[in-house]
């Protein structure tokens, strides 16, 4: 075969980039990779329709996110929005789809059982047990519920560590970004809490993901709370509290959980 002329080779090299579709206005100054990452984020946490991810639906969902995080409603990506999207966070969506969390699911019994079914190698098992009990106590001191640990059988709330796909159609993504997720009260997976085993979990004595803070947040979901848009609340979707050692439930957390269960009287 005769050698292909260099001019033709150069034209063929330029064709893909020359005819590549430009990104929509909503992409702002972001590149294609960040545009696609933003689409995935909005699809997961704001229910951007995966079948109709056009510029208009993207703009609408981005405005919902901007409103949630108290940002100007531009409908356009920015480096700051990308920064928020890349923060470690809970895997539960920030807005409810259909009846998820919107019908105020709650436990009907005043005694809730829980079981720790698997552990992380980052912390001693007894430390995980202590932290889970402490996280539950932060909630129970505000509402007329008590929690009883069981070691065998099926509990109302089952807590464990897993990696990747783990049987609930919500696979973990490896180190960073999604740290954990939980399900609202109900049968089956209802109330269960899953932590990403690929994350590095700590008790606050070293750098890493503070397990007490994450457990308190996820157990809030187990009790029926959705995400709060109050940055001071434990139920805020991203994990960014500066002082993990002395954190406590914010007024927003307390008022929300007491709206579901009432105040503790003793």
Label each residue range with its predicted role.
Residues 2-266:
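Zinc-dependent metalloendopeptidases
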